Design a protein with these regions (language model features):
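A short, flexible loop at the N-terminus of ABC-type nucleotide-binding domains that lies
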Residues: 1-15
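Helix-to-loop junction immediately C-terminal to a conserved catalytic motif
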Residues: 44
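Conserved ABC transporter NBD signature motif
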Residues: 52-65
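H-loop/switch region of ABC-family ATPase nucleotide-binding domains
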Residues: 195-196
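Catalytic Walker B motif of ABC-type/P-loop ATPase nucleotide-binding domains
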Residues: 160-163
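Conserved ABC ATPase "signature" region
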Residues: 112-130
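ABC ATPase C-loop
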Residues: 152-153
Length: 217
């Protein structure tokens, strides 16, 4: 439920229950207002449910900081550092984090190690490492989304939650994203895709749920 600042509350999710195994990819679709974004925020610990609990490997979510990564619907909200390089390193845990989300701090690293992390992450999502010195606002919407994903993958999470991951991507970028995610899934990464439609993600996901008025079926 949401607290409206009144004696009344607005129920958003109702008896939602799901299990995501290691190496499994699940797709949840739903119309606007169905509770998709609320679900993603509950699963990452950004919202605390009024009833029920979220666990990872039997541990409560509040003890799993750094194990779950969220790719937000609007990538620009995740990119709040002055350059592509600093944003990727911050998302990977090597630098102060600004904005929403919890990232496990991994300590200081050398310039060379930072360059290696950034180069590998950018190449993984099909971006030229030469873009690392660019300001975020110099990028296209599709490039921003790929930079955000690069940083999340560089943090090596156990679970990756993607909220409308195909927004702003052309066909070639979509195909690349699916290929990258499928490779990580085969390596054991659990992936939850939340979207208003299939967006081609049905080729990646082996399970499909539908969220309607807060009920998952």
């Amino acid at each position: 439920t949401y607290d409206l600042g009144t004696p009344w509350e607005k129920p958003v999710l109702r008896d939602v229950s799901l299990i995501l195994d290691p190496g499994q990819a699940m797709l949840i679709t739903g119309d606007n207002g169905s509770g998709k974004t609320t679900l993603s925020r509950v699963l990452t610990g950004l919202l605390v449910p009024t009833w029920g609990r979220v666990t990872l490997g039997g541990r409560p979510m509040e003890r799993c900081v750094g194990d779950v990564a969220l790719s937000m619907q609007f990538a620009r909200l995740q990119l709040q550092r002055p350059s592509v390089r600093s944003d990727i390193l911050a998302a990977a845990g090597h630098g102060p984090r600004i904005g929403t989300g919890s990232v496990h701090r991994k300590g200081a690293i050398s310039r060379e190690e930072g360059d290696r992390i950034v180069d590998e992450a950018m190449e993984l999502v099909g971006l030229d490492p030469a873009l690392a010195t660019r300001g975020i606002d110099d990028l296209s919407g599709g490039q921003m989304r790929r930079v955000a994903l690069a940083g999340l993958l560089a943090s090596h999470p156990s679970v990756l939650i993607l909220d409308e991951p195909m927004a702003g991507l052309d066909v070639a970028s979509r195909d690349l994203l699916i290929s990258v995610l499928d490779e990580r899934r085969r390596a054991g990464l659990s992936i939850l895709v939340i979207s208003h439609d299939l967006e081609g993600m049905d080729s990646l996901c082996d399970t499909h749920g539908r969220l309607a008025e807060g009920v998952l079926s």
